[in-house]
């Protein structure tokens, strides 16, 4: 039986020892409380004495309660965590001891001690093994190459491509090609990450001295001596000098009809590429200067805004002046014209019957405290205000002074009330616009 227990222990230990790495998800402090218990005893005189006591055992119980609280929280959120990390395992790690804010003891009144323990909820993180690279990733990671290659083909967007060592390369940098575009030299052939399918032609670099390809009728020996599509075969290469094939296959005619890069090819390629290279250099060193256009547009907008503000101020001032001017019309001191204020005044006078001379008009209400005075209560008379009557320090304030003070205070309260109402209305209007 003992051996079975040991075997089971080893079986459980091995997976845990080889477990994945663990990372913390959340850390929190969990709390338990030790509440004092009432203990009754008697003093020396035999009188009953009550004490509130907390022992070390109570602190241990409070610590266990804090750990149980952490376990309850872990059990509640474990299902949610499993949905977030379905391939992970979860565990709760708590401290061995708790932190208390007091010590065991006794007091005359009820009291408590708080026990706190830190709980760390963790999840397993599997060791990620590097996956094998795909053929596309292998091709894309290869470094650029340079040189002259045959079997070059042109892409849909006009670029030149080769299939070399099982990967596709694109010609970048300075590129020079023959007239037919099947042989090109580039300063940088960069891999595109594309893997050619079986059956697609592959390219090979042309070494120094190679002036031809392996076209029809040509061979390796024909290429070495100038053969090509029409170059000599086995006798037009190394044996061309003795059999006469060299003069017609690899000799004078082989160079002109083969796949070599001639002086004319290089000159033509440079001539074609020069404008684009010049434009690219110019674009990289310069940029369009639109500062003048932007400044002109900004000046025009500023002028329009200034004119609009000036006209609005002028119309407003003229309208206010015409409203308070006794003469108006052609004899007005503020100029003539139908401003927005003038139209508003005409509407107020003609349709609403509001005149600045009338009782309760807007103009008089804002500036004259007597406009609304008839509606304000005036009281039931006035008597002199007397302090310390009959003494040497008697102070007496007459009704005339009291009336003046009352008038001033009522005017102040009226202004404050109007200002409060005005602020409230404008604040509501601003909020409505937003």
UniProtKB/Swiss-Prot annotation:
Name the Gene Ontology biological process terms: adhesion receptor-mediated virion attachment to host cell; entry receptor-mediated virion attachment to host cell; viral extrusion; virion attachment to host cell pilus
- In this chain, the stretch annotated as N1 covers 20-130
Region G1 (Gly-rich linker): list its residue ranges.
89-107
Q: Where is the composition biased (Gly residues)?
A: 211-257
Signal peptide as annotated in the record: 1-19
Name the residues that span the membrane. Answer: 408-429
The alphabetized UniProt keywords are: Capsid protein, Disulfide bond, Host membrane, Host-virus interaction, Membrane, Signal, Transmembrane, Transmembrane helix, Viral attachment to host adhesion receptor, Viral attachment to host cell, Viral attachment to host cell pilus, Viral attachment to host entry receptor, Viral extrusion, Viral penetration into host cytoplasm, Viral penetration into host cytoplasm via pilus retraction, Viral release from host cell, Virion, Virus entry into host cell
Stretches the record annotates as Gly-rich linker: 209-258
The subcellular localization recorded is: Virion; Host membrane
Give one Pfam family.
Answer: G3P_pilus-bind
Q: Which Gene3D superfamilies match?
A: 3.30.110.160, Phage FD Coat Protein,Membrane penetration domain
Give an example GO cellular component term for this record.
viral capsid
Task: State the membrane topology.
Answer: Single-pass type I membrane protein
Instruction: Report the InterPro entries cross-referenced here.
Output: Attachment_G3P_N, Attachment_G3P_N_sf
Which Cys residues form disulphide pairs?
A: 63-98, 139-167, 177-184
Note down the stretches annotated as region N2. Answer: 132-200
Region Disordered: start-end pairs: 191-260
Region entry CT: which residue ranges?
A: 252-434, 259-434
Domain characteristics, as noted in the entry:
Consists of 3 domains (N1/D1, N2/D2, and CT), a glycine-rich repeats and a C-terminal transmembrane segment. The N2 domain interacts with the F pilus, whereas the N1 domain forms a complex with the C-terminal domain of TolA although with low affinity. The pilus and TolA binding domains are independent of each other in stability and folding.
What is the documented function of this protein? Answer: Plays essential roles both in the penetration of the viral genome into the bacterial host via pilus retraction and in the extrusion process. During the initial step of infection, G3P mediates adsorption of the phage to its primary receptor, the tip of host F-pilus. Attachment of the phage causes pilus retraction bringing the viral particle into close proximity of the host cell inner membrane. Subsequent interaction with the host entry receptors TolA (low affinity) and penetration of the viral DNA into the host cytoplasm.
Family, according to the entry, reads as follows:
Belongs to the inovirus G3P protein family.
**What's the subunit arrangement here?**
Interacts with G6P; this interaction is required for proper integration of G3P and G6P into the virion. Interacts with G8P. Interacts with the tip of the host pilus. Interacts (via N-terminus) with host TolA.
Q: What is this protein called?
A: Attachment protein G3P
Organism annotation: Salmonella phage IKe
Lineage of origin:
Viruses, Monodnaviria, Loebvirae, Hofneiviricota, Faserviricetes
């Amino acid at each position: 039986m003992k051996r079975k227990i040991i075997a089971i222990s080893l079986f459980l230990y091995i997976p845990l020892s080889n477990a994945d790495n663990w990372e913390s998800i959340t850390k929190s402090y969990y709390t338990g409380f030790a509440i004092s218990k009432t203990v009754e005893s008697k003093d020396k005189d035999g009188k009953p004495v009550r004490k509130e006591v907390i022992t070390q055992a109570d602190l241990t119980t409070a610590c266990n309660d804090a750990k149980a609280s952490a376990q309850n929280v872990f059990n509640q959120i474990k299902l949610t965590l499993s949905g977030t990390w379905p391939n992970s395992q979860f565990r709760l790690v708590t401290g061995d001891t708790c932190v208390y804010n007091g010590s065991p003891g006794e007091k005359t009144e009820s009291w408590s001690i708080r026990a706190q323990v830190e709980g760390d909820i963790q999840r397993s993180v599997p060791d990620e093994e590097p996956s094998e690279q795909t053929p596309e990733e292998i091709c894309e990671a290869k470094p650029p190459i340079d040189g002259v290659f045959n079997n070059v083909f042109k892409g849909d967007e006009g670029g030149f491509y080769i299939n070399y060592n099982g990967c596709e390369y694109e010609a970048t940098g300075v590129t020079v090609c023959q007239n037919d575009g099947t042989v090109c030299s580039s300063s940088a052939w960069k891999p595109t990450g594309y893997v050619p399918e079986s059956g697609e032609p592959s390219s090979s670099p042309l070494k120094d001295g190679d002036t031809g390809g392996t076209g029809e009728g040509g061979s390796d020996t024909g290429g070495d001596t100038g053969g090509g599509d029409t170059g000599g075969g086995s006798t037009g290469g190394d044996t061309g000098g003795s059999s006469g094939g060299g003069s017609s296959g690899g000799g004078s005619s082989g160079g002109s009809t083969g796949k070599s890069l001639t002086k004319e090819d290089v000159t033509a390629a440079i001539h074609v590429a020069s404008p684009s290279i010049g434009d690219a250099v110019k674009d990289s060193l310069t940029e369009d200067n639109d500062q003048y256009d932007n400044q002109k547009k900004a000046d025009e907008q500023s002028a329009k805004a200034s004119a609009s503000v000036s006209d609005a101020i002028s119309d407003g001032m003229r309208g206010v002046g015409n409203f308070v001017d006794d003469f108006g019309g052609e004899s007005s001191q503020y100029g003539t014209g139908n401003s927005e204020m003038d139209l508003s005044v005409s509407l107020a006078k003609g349709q609403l019957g509001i005149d600045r001379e009338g009782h309760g008009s807007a103009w008089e209400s804002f500036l004259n405290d007597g406009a609304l005075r008839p509606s304000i209560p005036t009281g039931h008379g006035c008597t002199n205000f007397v302090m310390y009557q009959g003494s040497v320090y008697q102070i007496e304030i007459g009704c005339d002074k009291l009336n003046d003070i009352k008038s001033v205070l009522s005017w102040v309260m009226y202004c404050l009330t109007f200002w409060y109402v005005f602020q409230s209305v404008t604040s509501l209007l601003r909020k409505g616009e937003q």
